[in-house]
Amino acid sequence: MKYLILIILFSNAMWSQNLESHQWKDRILVVNADEKNRERAESQYLLLNKEQQKLIDRKIVLYKCIADTCMFYDWKNTPKMFKTDTTKQGFSIVLIGLDGGEKYKSNTVEKPDVFLNLIDTMPMRRQELRNRK
């Protein structure tokens, strides 16, 4: 069930498997937008891009999907583009935790601190911080 959201968001089997490969390694932000909401998706990306080091520190990767084109950002390597055969409706952003579960969902552009602060309250993040000391 926890992967159902991933499969729904990306029907392309190869990329669904790649999303599953993030479990226990990365937190995932998925920004979905139809063509009409392209500007909102780009605005969300620009806000996140300004916080790259904080995203890397929290193991956050981003899938930005507009219409049938997705970009994958891990903030360390060149972004990767791929096509999907699913049609997006409106605008949404979803945070998926290390365990593969949905942690946050919104239909509005959010400041990065919304995600960063939420992650900082999660037990696994707290453990990561304790282990650094």
Regions found by a protein language model. Give the residues of each.
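Non-catalytic interaction/Regulatory regions outside core domains
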Residues: 2, 12-133
